[in-house]
Amino acid sequence: MAKEWVAVAYEEDFFVGQIEKKLANKVRVTFLEQKKDIFFSWPKRKDRADIKPAFIFCRNLEVLQEKDNYIVKHLTELRQKFEGFSSKYFSQNN
């Protein structure tokens, strides 16, 4: 069974990864590292976190593999979705 590609929001930016495991109230996600433009790869040291599903702002991403690189399709639209999510959930009321 293929692992689901997701985009996870943090306050400053978002990260693309795969859901590895579903836990009680969280999911374990292993993240890619952005190299240049639309190109990503697995970091030398595994980057994983247990996160609340509420921080997944986009599911079933289209990610293509080319040798050791991964290409995240529609990255511009994904960034726009993140900016909308971020302004709604992370912006501080002054």
Would you name each region that the model predicts?
Residues E4, D13-K22:
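Short beta-strand-centered aromatic/proline hotspots
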Residues M1:
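Extended catalytic cores and adjacent scaffolds of nucleotide/polyanion-binding enzymes
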Residues V27-N94:
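Epigenetic mark-reader domains in eukaryotic nuclear proteins
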Residues E4-Y10, V29:
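A short beta-strand micro-motif
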